[in-house]
Amino acid sequence: MTRKSDLSPIGVDAAASGETFEGGFPLTLGANRIKAVFAGNARELLGRASIAALAVFIVGAGLTCVAQLMIARIIGPDSYGVYAYVLAWVTLLGYLSTLGFHVSLLRFVPAYQAKGEWALARGVIQYSQRRIARTAFCIVLVGICGIAALRGSLRPELALSFLLGIATVPFLALHLIGASVARAFGGIIAALAPERIVRDGLALAIVATVFWGSLYRLDATLAMAATLLSSIAVLGLVRITVRRLRPPALGHVKPVYAAEDWWRPTLPLTVITIADNLMSRSAVIALGLTGNTRDAGIFAAAFSVATVTALPRMAVAISFAPTVSALFALGDRTGLQSVATKAAWLSLIGTACAAIPLLLLAHPLLAWFGRDFVAGAPIVTILVLGQVFAAACGPQQHLITMTGNERAGATILAVCASSSFAGCVLMIGSFGMTGAAFATTLTLVGWNVAMAIFIHRSLHLMPGVLAPFKAMPRRKRAADYGI
C-alpha cells in the first residue's frame, strides 16, 4: 500500500523560478500550472520519478540484505528468529500509530496545494503529527505494562527485545509521517534515503562495532537496540528534509483545521494500514505465536530476499499516489486510465527483471545467511510468483484510496489480511513454513483480483496490464467509423 508514494508536485514560488528537484521534475508547481503538467506529461513524470525512486530502493534493498545477512550470521538463527518476530510486531504497531495519516497526507497535501489552500495544508500536517505522537506514546505505555505482566512467561531475550522494540514505535511512527510530508512536497530521494539507506546502514554499523569489539552479548537484544538507535537518527534526518522542502507559502499562513473531513477517510486508512502490515507479516507473527521463532527467522530471511521483486512496484507507487490524487481532483478520468496503465507496465517489467535471477539464485543467496536458512529457498519461489502477479495488476490500492474509496479498500484488505493470518495458522500445523508461504501468496493473488473487480465496476477503469488490450477493439471500431 502504500505507504510510499510520491510524484509531488505542488507549490507556487518554485514554479515561477523554474526550480527543480533531483531527477529533473518540478519540486513545486503552481495551482494554475498543475493541469498542464498532468494533462501533458503525467506518464513522463511518472516514469522519471519511478526510476529515481527505484534507484534508491535498489541501493536500499542491497544494503538491507547485507544488514540482515550480517545480523543473522552474527547473532545466529535462533536469536535472529526472535529479532524478526519482535520487529514484525514493532512495525505493525508503528504503522498502527500513524492512524492512516501517513497515507491520507499524500492525498490531502497535494490536493490542497493544487487548489492553493495553504492554511488547510499546514493544518492537516500539524494535526496529524500531534495525534500520531499521542497515539504512539499510549501504545508504548500499554506495551510496557503488557510485557511486565507477561515477563514470567517470556524468555529474558524475548522480553528485553520487546521492551526495546516498543520504545522504537514512536520514532517509527513520526518518521513515517515526516516522510509522507516530504514526499508530498516533492522529495522522493530525500524522503526515501534515510529510511532505505541510513537506517539499515547505521544498524549494521552498530551491530558490527559491538561484534568486533566484543562490547555486548550477540543476541536479539543487540539487533533491536541497533534498530532503536537508527530509528532515532532517521527521524532527525527526515525532520531536516521536511524543513528544507517546505514551500515558503506554507510558513506565511495560520493553520486551519478540518478534523471531521480528515478523519472521514483516515479511519478506513487506519484499517488499511493494520491489515496491510498484518498480511505481509502474518506468517512471521503466526510462526512466533506458535513458538517457532527459529522458523520465523528463516521465513523472514526468505521473505526479505523475495521482497526484492516488489521494489519496482513500490517505486512506481511512490510516484503514483499524489499523481492520482491531483488527477482525480481535476476530474481527469482519461489521465487516470493512462497513468494507471503506465504504472502497471512499469511494475511488471521491473518485477520480471528482478524475479528471473532471484528464482535462479535463491539457494545461494540464502546460504549466505547461514546453512539453516537454505530451507527457505522454496519459500522464496512461492513468494516471488505472487509478487509477479501483483505487479501485473499495478498499484491498485493507491488507485482506490486516492480516489476517495478508502472504505471499500479497507474492507477488501481487512478480509484478505484476516484470511492470510488464519490461513498461515492453519497451514503451519500441517506444512510448516511452506504452508505459510502458500497462504501468503494465495491471499496476495486474491486481494489483487478483488481490487481489480472493484476498480472496474466502481471507477470504470481497466486495471493492470490488460487495459490497452481491452481498449483495442473499441479504438478499432471507432476508426472504422471515422470517429
Task: Please describe what each predicted stretch is.
Residues 49-65, 198-199, 223-246, 253-322, ...:
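Transmembrane helical elements of multi-pass membrane transporters/channels
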Residues 19-32, 44-103, 140-144, 168, ...:
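Signature of the first transmembrane helix
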Residues 99-115, 184, 302-331, 337-340, ...:
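Helix-loop junctions and terminal segments of transmembrane helices
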Residues 172-197, 384-413:
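Membrane-interface junctions at transmembrane-helix termini in multi-pass inner-membrane proteins
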Residues 11, 18-29, 48-60, 86, ...:
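Membrane-water interface segments that mark the loop-to-transmembrane alpha-helix transition
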Residues 38, 42-47, 148-165, 293-294, ...:
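Interfacial segments at transmembrane-helix termini and the short loops linking adjacent helices
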Residues 14, 26-46, 216-226, 234-280, ...:
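Interhelical loop/hinge segments that connect adjacent transmembrane helices in multipass membrane
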Residues 163, 193-246, 415-419, 433-457:
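Hydrophobic alpha-helical transmembrane segments
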